[in-house]
């Protein structure tokens, strides 16, 4: 069979397995030639390891200098009668293959990271086959739902404002059109539920569970990822349900840092730049900002994707020559620093007001935006024969 891209709105309904393989290899090739991670961790757990920042973290730490053994947890779907499976499924497989070829452990756990059963499986594996202790825990779970650990009822996140409704343009990748979308005002319950799903509660619970099991090494670090952005995005992000959840995440880092300091450990949130990820394309009215930002940063030669961001985080912030991790006044690591430089934001603001539904494909970097989205799912990568006939049976034999 020949696998074609299928996009519905901003959701990819298909993935190209060997395009995903190429994307993983491209990221590995980048970190192998970048400034290396020195004095880095050797045993790493990545929660949410199959795409975006989680996958990039795993690649950076394994191949970007530290030569870390990694465990990745993700909720992905393999090939079945419903289709070829998700991009993350293949990212996991091909990462593991590359890691093992390099003499590293790249263990994948496929399932629900929120369940006690998954935690126990991971802890058992750490104790019996992974050397017993972790040097770093990366928390990069991006999901819209989380079960209440006591009742099993689902909390569902909402991307809404906490003030007046906001109307703004958003992009439909399926139709290559820009459409107006209104973001409504969240109810108190929606605000609370979003905090439960996207805040720091589950991160803290994981760290507590791992600590109680005795699998955190002395000096272990943990990091989660966040976004703050410029004032131009505040109404939809910073001052909305997402911003409230991220504030909870930031506060959680401080609480975890206090706990982990007793064993020489540290906990941080790294604030990253705006990027095209499976999660970010869902944020209404956010895409015009990304179109303008990408164009300006590429023109200036300072654009970064997930892998560049993570390599810079681990080589220049969390590890390396810094004996003290550089943070801002709120104890946040800032790798959004280039995005927020004054001259870049000035140019982005000037460009945003010029972007319209008629000209967005040329005025902003829509080609780059769409290419990033397609590449998340294994399409549009050089070196891949997209006309090749792929045997479905072969895909079912690939082992995660």
From Swiss-Prot:
Annotated pathway:
Lipid metabolism; fatty acid biosynthesis
Residues that coordinate or bind NAD(+):
48-53, 75-76, 112-113, 141-142, 246, 275-277
Reaction(s) catalysed by this chain, per the record, are: a 2,3-saturated acyl-[ACP] + NAD(+) = a (2E)-enoyl-[ACP] + NADH + H(+)
The protein's UniProt keywords, in alphabetical order, are: Fatty acid biosynthesis, Fatty acid metabolism, Lipid biosynthesis, Lipid metabolism, NAD, Oxidoreductase
Coiled-coil region(s) at which residues? none
Please provide, alphabetically and separated by semicolons, the GO molecular function terms listed in this UniProt record: enoyl-[acyl-carrier-protein] reductase (NADH) activity; NAD binding; trans-2-enoyl-CoA reductase (NADH) activity
Enzyme Commission number(s): 1.3.1.9
- Which BP terms from GO are recorded? fatty acid biosynthetic process
Q: Kindly give the Pfam families that the UniProt entry links to this protein.
A: Eno-Rase_FAD_bd (PF07055), Eno-Rase_NADH_b (PF12242), Enoyl_reductase (PF12241)
Sequence positions that bind substrate: 227
* Active site per the UniProt annotation: 237
Annotated site location: Plays an important role in discriminating NADH against NADPH: 76
Function in brief: Involved in the final reduction of the elongation cycle of fatty acid synthesis (FAS II). Catalyzes the reduction of a carbon-carbon double bond in an enoyl moiety that is covalently linked to an acyl carrier protein (ACP).
Family per record: Belongs to the TER reductase family.
Quaternary state and partners of this protein? Monomer.
Name-wise, this protein is: Enoyl-[acyl-carrier-protein] reductase [NADH] 2
| Species, as recorded | Photobacterium profundum (strain SS9)
